[in-house]
């Protein structure tokens, strides 16, 4: 019978049946591949990243909110099909299937690992374990960058983007000072109102102001209201720089996932305009700074200290000169890396700081210890004739605060899964506890997902893993000898020993270049705020509920973020009774 003469219902039914058969054949093929590896495996019909998974997530997630908030995780039948399931599951799936297992679907194989030694091995074999292009292309709305490139292109990007973050570049000093200034403005704002504030909004304002100045050299006052951002539009533009920055950072998820042409046809039109306007502003800044570099020999001195934009352009100029080329980075490559700085320096830092503030409000005992350390550092500075702190003299004195920061990074990592793939058959080594290492061969195109949560909450690596214990970073066991006897670097040296067991900043050959930049901002804000104030829960906030929900639920942004409803307050230290 001719297909055109089939009833519509029969045609649809036949098509659906053929589609299901096609999926079953593919599933059977990948099951065969999984068996050859010798690893345990489990089956799933639909992955979280497929269209159907994305469609199901907003429909199904609300049905399980109560269950998730109690820390019970997802039912087995649905967990792998829900976006961002890994945060709610923590280690549960690995306790059932093992530290290393395969997830088999009609789309292929995914190797999930919570084995820290294997994670470290994978992160260091960067030419064998690549970043999946389909996963990372989304991070190139303006151009390629150091996070999305591979091979020789990655080496090229690192040579130019790494120097701006070195201690001698001045970037860490710049971010410390700006973060301290913005934190003082935050305190002034909170103290004047003497009320509960929107924590999420204020932390985001602070970090946006910091990255605006340290990234582009454009100062944004903490108190600037959204309505004020709309003013002062230069000729040739449709909105101000800071309004564009505000919209792009606020709606980062939509910009990364939704095509611009779709946004222009909907209520998201203003977001699409902001996306284009920010690109226009950044290209203008790139051209202006490039012109300065070409005209002013002192301006392009290797010892000159500037914002990240200036530093990247300077490093690019030196790279080009060393290679005998006219230029190193193209304008698109500079733009792509500036966007990456914006993403990491704004959203990731803001979320980590928010988790830290909430934790301190819940744990006044931890706040006591940090305040004690802060007071001690300020006293040392006063004895030296200084009225304020700075990065060079004071950053490394914050040992307990550093340990607290790293515990927050461990318990609430910005990225829950680090994704890799093998372009050809590749051998992995699994390191079972109390057993000999085992080798397995993963087939070409197999994804390898490093489950950050499952490692960070693993008792094998972190005794009492759910507990936030800054002191675990203060021990000297396994710490390299201090080569700088005048520096208090125990906690920092300790953080270098946890190979593969702490992946907040990734690790190995592709560790985050800006981790010291983030640490400087984080500690500067805490030292400034806690020098005069305490962080407490706002009125009406139930500590038990808040703790449950920051541990088990998330806001569903590009990086891990707490739910937005948590309210905090700043109280003068003299007004708060503790103990």
Curated annotation (Swiss-Prot):
Keyword Oxidoreductase recorded: yes
Glycosylation sites: 2, 194, 390
GO molecular function: heme binding; iron ion binding; monooxygenase activity; oxidoreductase activity, acting on paired donors, with incorporation or reduction of molecular oxygen
Listed InterPro entries: Cyt_P450 (IPR001128), Cyt_P450_CS (IPR017972), Cyt_P450_E_grp-I (IPR002401), Cyt_P450_sf (IPR036396), Cytochrome_P450_monoxygenase (IPR050121)
Cofactors required: heme
Pathway assigned to this chain's UniProt record: Sesquiterpene biosynthesis
Superkingdom field: Eukaryota
Pfam name, any one: p450
Any one GO biological process: mycotoxin biosynthetic process
Positions of heme binding: 512
A GO CC term assigned to this protein in UniProt: membrane
EC numbers for this chain: 1.-.-.-
Membrane-spanning segments: 7-29
Coiled coil regions, renumbered to chain: none
First-listed, main subcellular location of the protein, grouped into a coarse class: membrane
Compartment annotation: Membrane
Effect of a null allele: Impairs the production of PR-toxin as well as of the intermediates eremofortin A and B.
Membrane topology type: Single-pass membrane protein
Keywords: Glycoprotein, Heme, Iron, Membrane, Metal-binding, Monooxygenase, Oxidoreductase, Transmembrane, Transmembrane helix
Reported function: Cytochrome P450 monooxygenase; part of the gene cluster that mediates the biosynthesis of PR-toxin, a bicyclic sesquiterpene belonging to the eremophilane class and acting as a mycotoxin. The first step of the pathway is catalyzed by the aristolochene synthase which performs the cyclization of trans,trans-farnesyl diphosphate (FPP) to the bicyclic sesquiterpene aristolochene. Following the formation of aristolochene, the non-oxygenated aristolochene is converted to the trioxygenated intermediate eremofortin B, via 7-epi-neopetasone.
Similarity remark: Belongs to the cytochrome P450 family.
Full protein name: Cytochrome P450 monooxygenase ORF6
Organism for this UniProt entry: Penicillium roqueforti (strain FM164)
Gene: ORF6
């Amino acid at each position: 019978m001719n297909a055109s003469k089939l009833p519509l219902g029969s045609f649809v039914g036949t098509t659906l049946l053929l589609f299901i058969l096609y999926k079953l054949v593919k599933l059977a093929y990948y099951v065969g591949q999984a068996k050859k590896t010798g690893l345990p495996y489990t089956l799933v019909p639909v992955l979280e990243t497929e269209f159907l998974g994305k469609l199901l997530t907003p429909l199904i997630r609300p049905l399980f909110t109560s269950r998730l908030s109690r820390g019970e995780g997802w039912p087995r039948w649905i967990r792998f099909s829900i976006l961002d399931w890994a945060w709610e599951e923590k280690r549960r799936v690995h306790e059932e299937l093992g530290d290393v297992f395969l997830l088999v679907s009609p789309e292929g194989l995914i190797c999930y690992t919570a084995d820290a030694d294997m994670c470290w091995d994978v992160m260091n074999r960067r030419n064998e374990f690549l970043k999946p292009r389909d996963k990372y292309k989304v991070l190139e709305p303006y151009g390629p960058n150091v996070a999305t490139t591979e091979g020789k292109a990655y080496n090229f990007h690192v040579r130019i983007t790494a120097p701006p973050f070195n201690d001698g570049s001045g970037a860490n000093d710049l971010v410390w000072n700006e973060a301290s200034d913005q934190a003082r403005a935050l305190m002034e704002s909170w103290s004047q109102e003497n009320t509960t504030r929107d924590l999420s909004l204020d932390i985001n304002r602070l970090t946006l102001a910091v990255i605006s100045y340290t990234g582009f050299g454009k100062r944004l006052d903490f108190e600037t209201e959204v309505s004020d951002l709309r003013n002062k539009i230069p000729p040739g533009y449709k909105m101000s720089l800071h309004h564009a920055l505000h919209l792009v950072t606020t709606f980062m998820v939509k910009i990364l996932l939704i095509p611009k042409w779709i946004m222009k046809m909907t209520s998201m039109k203003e977001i699409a305009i902001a996306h284009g306007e920010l690109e226009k502003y950044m290209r203008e800044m790139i051209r202006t700074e490039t012109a300065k570099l070409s005209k002013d020999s002192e301006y392009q001195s290797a010892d000159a200290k500037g914002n990240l934009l200036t530093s990247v352009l300077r490093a690019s100029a030196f790279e080009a000169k060393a290679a005998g080329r006219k230029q190193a980075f193209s304008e698109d490559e500079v733009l792509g890396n500036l966007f990456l700085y914006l993403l990491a320096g704004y959203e990731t830092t803001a979320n980590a700081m928010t988790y830290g503030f909430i934790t301190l409000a819940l744990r006044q005992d931890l706040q006591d210890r940090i305040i004690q350390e802060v007071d001690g550092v300020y006293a040392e500075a006063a004895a030296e004739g200084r009225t304020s702190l700075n990065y060079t003299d004071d950053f490394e004195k914050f040992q307990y605060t550093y340990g607290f920061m790293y515990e927050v990074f461990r318990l609430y990592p910005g990225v829950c899964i680090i994704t890799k793939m093998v372009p050809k058959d590749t051998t992995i080594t699994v390191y079972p506890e109390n057993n000999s290492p085992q080798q397995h061969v993963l087939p070409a195109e197999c994804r390898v997902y490093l489950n950050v949560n499952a490692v960070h909450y693993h008792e094998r690596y972190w005794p009492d893993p759910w507990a936030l214990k800054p002191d675990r970073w203060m021990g000297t066991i396994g710490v390299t000898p201090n080569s700088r006897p005048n520096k208090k670097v125990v906690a920092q040296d300790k953080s270098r020993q946890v190979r593969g067991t702490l992946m907040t900043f990734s690790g190995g050959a592709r560790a985050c270049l800006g981790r010291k930049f983030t640490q400087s901002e984080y500690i500067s804000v805490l030292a400034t705020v806690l020098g005069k104030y305490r962080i407490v829960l706002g009125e009406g906030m139930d500590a038990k509920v808040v703790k449950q929900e920051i541990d088990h639920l998330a806001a569903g942004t590009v990086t891990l973020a707490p739910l937005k409803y948590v309210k905090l307050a700043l109280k003068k230290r003299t007004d708060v009774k503790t103990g």
